[in-house]
Amino acid sequence: MTTKEQFIEMAKGITRPGIDQMMAWLETTDFYTAPASTRFHGAEEGGLCAHSITVAKRLLEIADLWAPNQYSRDALLTVALFHDLCKISTYTVSPRNVKDDTPGQWTKVPFYKFEPKDSVGCDSHGSLSCYRIMAT
């Protein structure tokens, strides 16, 4: 199963009104192919989607362990899967030269650069994710 398919399967556990519109909107973005960061977790094609899945799995595990039946699975999945929507359409890819194992050899590799286009007045990463959820 691809990362995108895993994400869609997990999102099927969300029953809130608007989830179908949210999933349709994600299809029009780079969410499934974007990185999660430029150098740290998920700094690769598809890293944003993969990171969101990992966060969802961990949150469900933690909730089951520390707060069983205290939060709805619906709420936990919503928070975890969509916590980084602010990163949609914020990365560009350009080549970067990296030293090869062979002395004097360099290899071009993709490098992600963070270039947010519009924060719509949001002052934080979290508030922009919330804005994007409300705007769909």
Segments (PLM) and residue ranges:
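Divalent metal-dependent catalytic cores for phosphoryl transfer on phosphate-bearing substrates
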Residues: 50, 62-136
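Non-catalytic interface/linker regions that flank or bridge core catalytic/transmembrane domains
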Residues: 1-34
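Residue-level recognition of alpha-helical structural elements
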Residues: 3, 18, 44, 71-74
